[in-house]
């Protein structure tokens, strides 16, 4: 039986503490669309997406109205296009990206993910074609998102792919220079990528997934901060317990929406992603949660420990609320999308090096990092390599979403707008990693990959 105080608590979470469902993401398998004729393949892709996702936006809006729960985004993820397009006669896959963009427009979703390649152990022909197409594909489309998995604990790190992604990111930034390198905000480089992630820009529909599935990503940093304000000065066991209870409530709401959406759309329910996803809105910041624990500024000594506590407690609370937890599930630390992170960078408290340490204990990695436009390809590749190493050795997902903003220098601010926010340009090392990156080859899998 629902108690009146629980109802009022939920209303307060939504109205005052920015609780929302960040995304309902429909995953669609395109494996049956592959053919040797590229136009036929693209027609099949468009028809299948528009058929299965025809009611996705309407159902999301109906649930939002009926339940009173804000649903910020409706999105689609598809089978990695490098797999679907590989048997076609196309030399580059830009037209496939345009087809995805057209389909996303037709059904009214915010983003579509899956312009992706999995190259942790090496390239196929389709992988090479897709990766070469990324800069132009992302700069010429509005809703298409791309991801490349360059490493895994089982395979090690494909350093040839790491090197190439440095070039791809620089090229994407140049082609979208008029928007501050916005194309790079739609590109993520992963290690140990999950196949059921509902969040962009890294979402794609894995080959082990069903024909069609609904995955939901929750949010709620403001709710967690508000809960911690009530136990200010208490010990860490109390802090952890408070976060766990709050994460339970947030996840329950996500599970409710996910099951209802899958029922109404007539497709399978997949997972709830527990990730605390911040926005540039004041009161919706992961950094402010860490500061509520007692840090003067996010990035000071103790930040990594505070984030580890937060991430662990969120998972413990969330897994008690749902038996279908997946995706990334933790705490996101995207600099440009988090008001507290932005302030910390401006104050000089938060550096790329500290963010890298934080990624050892949180959900993803170096996310929405803006660096000077003259940052070299090799430096970007080296940043990716460092992050991939953390993921591979620790058997966790890590990622890099980095924007070398054309014409910008350290201290400048780049405005992206919307959920992407604004990013202060951060300093990178002045010393070169060129000779290291140009070695190429593959960093072998670690000993802890042998688990049988």
Swiss-Prot record:
InterPro entries: UPF0210. It comes from the Bacteria. Gene3D superfamilies: 3.20.70.20. It holds the Pfam family DUF711. Homodimer. Belongs to the UPF0210 family. This is UPF0210 protein Cthe_0410.
């Amino acid at each position: 039986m629902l108690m009146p105080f629980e109802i009022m608590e939920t209303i307060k979470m939504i109205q005052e503490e920015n609780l929302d469902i960040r995304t309902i993401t429909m995953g669609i398998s395109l494996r049956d669309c592959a053919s040797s004729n590229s136009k036929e393949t693209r027609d099949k892709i468009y028809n299948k997406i528009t058929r299965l996702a025809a009611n996705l936006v309407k159902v999301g809006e109906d649930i939002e109205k009926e339940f009173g729960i804000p649903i910020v985004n409706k999105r689609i993820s598809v089978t990695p296009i490098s797999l679907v397009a590989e048997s076609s006669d196309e030399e580059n896959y830009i037209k496939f990206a345009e087809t995805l963009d057209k389909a996303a427009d037709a059904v009214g979703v915010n983003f579509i993910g899956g312009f992706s390649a999995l190259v942790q152990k090496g390239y196929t022909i389709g992988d090479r074609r897709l990766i070469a197409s990324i800069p132009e594909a992302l700069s010429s489309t509005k809703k298409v998102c791309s991801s490349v998995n360059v490493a895994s604990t089982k395979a090690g790190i494909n350093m040839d792919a790491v090197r190439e992604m440095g070039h791809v990111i620089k090229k994407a930034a140049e082609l979208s220079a008029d928007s501050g390198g916005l194309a790079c905000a739609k590109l993520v480089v992963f290690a140990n990528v999950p196949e059921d992630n509902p969040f962009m820009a890294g979402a794609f529909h894995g080959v082990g997934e069903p024909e069609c599935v609904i995955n939901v990503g929750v949010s709620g940093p403001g709710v967690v901060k508000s809960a911690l304000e009530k136990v200010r000065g208490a010990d860490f066991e109390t802090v952890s317990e408070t976060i766990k209870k709050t994460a339970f409530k947030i996840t329950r709401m996500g599970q409710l929406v996910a099951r209802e959406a899958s029922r109404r759309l007539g497709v399978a329910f997949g997972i709830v992603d527990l990730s605390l996803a911040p926005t540039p809105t004041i009161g919706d910041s992961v950094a402010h949660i860490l500061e509520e624990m007692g840090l003067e500024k996010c990035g000071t000594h103790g930040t990594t420990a505070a984030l580890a506590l937060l991430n662990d407690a969120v998972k413990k609370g969330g897994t008690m609320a749902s038996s279908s937890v997946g995706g990334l599930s933790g705490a996101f630390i995207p600099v440009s999308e988090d008001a507290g992170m932005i302030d910390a960078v401006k104050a000089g408290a938060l550096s790329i090096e500290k963010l890298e340490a934080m990624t050892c204990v949180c959900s993803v990695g170096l996310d929405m990092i803006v660096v000077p436009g003259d940052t070299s390809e090799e430096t970007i590749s080296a940043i990716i390599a460092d992050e991939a190493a953390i993921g591979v050795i620790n058997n966790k997902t890590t990622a890099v979403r980095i924007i070398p903003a054309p014409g910008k220098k350290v201290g400048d601010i780049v405005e992206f707008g919307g959920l992407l926010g604004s990013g202060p340009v951060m300093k990178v090392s002045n010393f070169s990693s060129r000779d290291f990156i140009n070695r190429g080859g593959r960093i072998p899998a670690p000993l802890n990959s042998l688990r049988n």
